[in-house]
Amino acid sequence: MAFSWLSFVLLALPVLALARPSEHEARSLFCSTPSNIPFNDDKLPDPFKFNDGSPVRSFADWDCRRQQLSALIQGYEAGTLPPRPPVVTSTFTKSGTTGNLTVTAGFPGKTITFSSPITFPTGTAPFGGWPLVIAYGGVSIPIPDGIAVLTYDNSAMAEQNDQSSRGVGLFFDVYGANATASSMTAWVWGLSRIIDSLEVTPAAHINTAKIAVTGCSRNGKGALMAGAFEERIALTIPQESGSGGDTCWRLSKFEQDSGDVVQQATEIVQENVWFSTNFDNYVFNISLLPYDHHELAALVAPRPLISYENTDFEWLSPLSGFGCMTAAHTVWEAMGIPDKHGFVQVGNHSHCDFPSSLNPTLFAFFDKFLLGKEANTSIFETNGLFNGTEWVASQWINWTTPRFTLL
């Protein structure tokens, strides 16, 4: 008997009718990710709602919601993060405990080359290679024994001097000065090329499943964005990132309106090029943003994140940092892994100093998530010094945290 595509379709129709996918199954097959949507809310946006208002109930749902948030953050403030380009090659040299990774990336006929020094621990690398910390601009936190450190010259990838830095740097030599990517987005692109190269450089003896990223102040903002956008980062450690980092735009505006001298969106876009020019259109009406930075931080989940803030510096927006990370924490809670998200906020030290009293909190995250040791990482604390401004969670968080199902 002849068998045609038509007869196959006719035979299959009843089966297809019975196997109609559920709403959540359909979303997993097709996830709508616009870069701009209608929105207006003075409260922090609910991370457990899709763009269309339907609920996020499962890990499968979160995969889609994460894609939506990434697209929105790029569309409104970060600019477009390009994918891996067709050309990525590298060379590696090592002498003693000092190595050097040189990466060439771009398109045929238009490539850039940059180098990053790596400091290795003494001794023989463990099975799988050394864990690695990628430090934006240099290390400002203590690193435990047994972890290599790569110093990433992110400012060469995209300058961050002032407004004149727009479109200047190695990234823009590839994608053009008019690329929408902010400097921080360009930094993520460069970091990803480093990881690409390490993945195919066995001589470096780096365990690319155990990579952390860190930075302080402006570089702390960049470290958080790297952890959010680059899923190969195993541990994210922003330090005193302040406005544009682990604080929320809405909460920083509230602090400013309450009389605190903090850096909010209207000022930060005049200082530097950490955000895309499109963000200028929203800084005077933050309520139009369909996200806030609790959701930037939540892009890291389910991977671990611990951030550090300093209440001695009012302009870092201490209430905003605590409130924003309190809101972000609900995503790890929904996943049943709150111990993968930490926050520490104290004072009595200079900006970007790391007091030794904080070492146990930091080393706990290193031990558990990079070194494979047992450690208690249920760490979420503040000294509560918010310059007289009061944090009231119900004023900003109007959602009930779900418990995610698998599907």
UniProtKB/Swiss-Prot annotation:
EC numbers for this chain: 3.1.1.117
Summary of temperature dependence: Optimum temperature is 45-55 degrees Celsius.
Signal peptide (UniProt feature, chain positions): 1-19
Gene Ontology molecular-function annotations: carboxylic ester hydrolase activity
Domain of life: Eukaryota
Catalytically driven reaction(s): a 4-O-methyl-alpha-D-glucuronosyl ester derivative + H2O = 4-O-methyl-alpha-D-glucuronate derivative + an alcohol + H(+)
Keyword Disulfide bond: yes
InterPro entries linked: AB_hydrolase_fold, GCE-like_dom
UniProt: substrate binding residues: 221, 263, 271, 315
Keywords: Disulfide bond, Glycoprotein, Hydrolase, Lignin degradation, Secreted, Serine esterase, Signal
Cellular component, GO, one term: extracellular region
Residue ranges crossing the lipid bilayer per the database entry: none
Top EC class, one word: hydrolase
Glycosylation sites: 100, 178, 285, 348, 376, 387, 398
Sequence motif: GXSYXG catalytic site motif, positions: 215-220
Gene Ontology biological process terms from the UniProt entry: lignin catabolic process
Similarity-based family: Belongs to the carbohydrate esterase 15 (CE15) family.
Protein name: 4-O-methyl-glucuronoyl methylesterase 2
Active site: 217 (nucleophile), 351 (proton donor/acceptor)
Protein task: Glucuronoyl esterase which may play a significant role in biomass degradation, as it is considered to disconnect hemicellulose from lignin through the hydrolysis of the ester bond between 4-O-methyl-D-glucuronic acid residues of glucuronoxylans and aromatic alcohols of lignin.
Disulfide bonds: 31-64, 216-352, 248-324
Compartments (UniProt record): Secreted
pH behavior: Optimum pH is 5.0-6.0.
